[in-house]
Amino acid sequence: GSGKMSSPAAGAPFPERAFNVTALKWNTCAWLLLPVLVFMAWWMHWYVSIPLAALMAVGLASGRRKELPERESLPSFPLFNRSSFLVLGAFIALMVLSGWGEWVNQHPDHIVRNACLRELVASPWPVVFPDGDVLIYNTGFWLVPALAGKVAGLGVARAFVVLWGAWGLFLAWLWLCVFSGRRSLLLALLMVMFGSLLNFQCWLGLDLFRLHYFGTAEQVMCSANASIPVMLFFIFLASGRMPPHWMPLLFAATAFYSPLAALGGLPLAVCQWLRQWKGSRTPRRSLFHPSFPAAVMLGACFLLYYAAVNAPSSHMGWRPFYTRPGDFLLAGTSFLLYALFCWRDFRRNSLFICTLATGLLLPFFYVNGDVNDLLCKGSVPAMACLLAFLASTWARHPRLRIWIWLLLALGLAPRFNVPYYCCSSSALQEFLTPSASCAEPSSFPCREWRQLTYAPQARHQDEWGRTMHHPGHRWHPYYSGTPRPWLRFIYRF
């Protein structure tokens, strides 16, 4: 299930530099940008989409010849071997058990996820509601599956969502293997288990509304549509193998999948770009690369699109933090304990320091009300980079592994995910349901067991049916917008 990868020089300090990852780079680029191109083709006017697509192609392709000699001297990094199929199968199972595909009982957030896919399959693109408003939502994750659904039906689209998400997770795992210098099944497990030490935080009675950095399994269950693309981009970024001229374009694509994640990850993207720009042979030429204007134009189009949403103005600003003892415990158990393992190897890595600074400063800012959306979504980039550093530390230092696994066991967030997995089947959920006469268990083990196995709210979330048009629902303004004249100039509304 695991194996060390060959290196051109024994004892090389950077094992991630030891292999040719051309195929992995282009697979990652295609996974991130294909939905963007679909969106441009069906949502934008041709006089905007065609020049922009051409500029993007030039930005991605230029500079490729200079990298060929270095690539040819390295052993290839195959996408598939026997362990790869096991990992891909495990990620497919994770997507299904997390509710994607609608085959099992789901978390309540899937009321919107299910309706979005059905709307995209059933409606012409761009989606215009009967009252003239338009769908404004980060639909990128569903566009390729929905395109398949328009040809072959909703059932195919649902299956494609699972496969599309599993492929994104698979690519992220491969980048962890590249960065750590070790292709290991256990790195896939580490990736899924990574997150805040939620069990420990709950036992201490900490206020999770003040700081809750969602783990990988939580992100996949609730918002794989936004989190998987962002995780993939920032793990790729942390590996140091992303071509500098790709960074602006692929970062602009993350704004399509999650604007708040792009905001939270902006310092990390800038830091890594500067780090690689300083090390390039032609730094001045990099500043005038065509990928920059392409990224600016693409980002501006996404910004105008999301700005047209009908949602009430978001409450945003800053708030005091680290004013209570529990705040320090939250920061420590959310990510600082993981960072301690990585400090020895990466304390001189500017991206690692920037990751720590971003994770420490994010709690001072908020967007929206009691649930801080900036922490929920804007923390994904920092956590993805920290995951990459932790995976590399895990591979380099076998003596630390038992301690890392112990932390991950506390960070698996079983209170959140595992009950849904246990209640994925209605029959199993009925079996686990406590009787009406059963009082709240008094012992700690019994309470923990119930938290671990039973989610009464798990069911097929189909209240919205086949459409996102529900004007009376309090969530509807967040997914609809009134097209303005300037928006109609860019988009085919």
What are these regions (language model features)?
Residues 30, 38-43, 297-493:
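Transmembrane helical bundles and short interhelical boundary loops of multi-pass, membrane-embedded
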Residues 97-231:
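Active-site lumenal/periplasmic loops and adjacent helix-entry segments of GT-C-fold
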Residues 35-40, 234-239, 244-270:
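Membrane-interface alpha helices of multi-pass inner-membrane proteins
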Residues 59-61, 168-179, 229-241, 267-274, ...:
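Transmembrane alpha-helical segments
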Residues 18-30, 75-85, 184-186, 244-247, ...:
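Membrane-interfacial loop-to-transmembrane alpha-helix junctions, especially the N-terminal start
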Residues 1-77, 194:
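Membrane-embedded, hydrophobic transmembrane alpha-helices
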Residues 35-45, 56-63, 80-108, 168-173, ...:
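Transmembrane signal-anchor helices characteristic of membrane glycosylation enzymes that use polyprenol
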Residues 264-294:
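Perimembrane helix-loop-helix junctions
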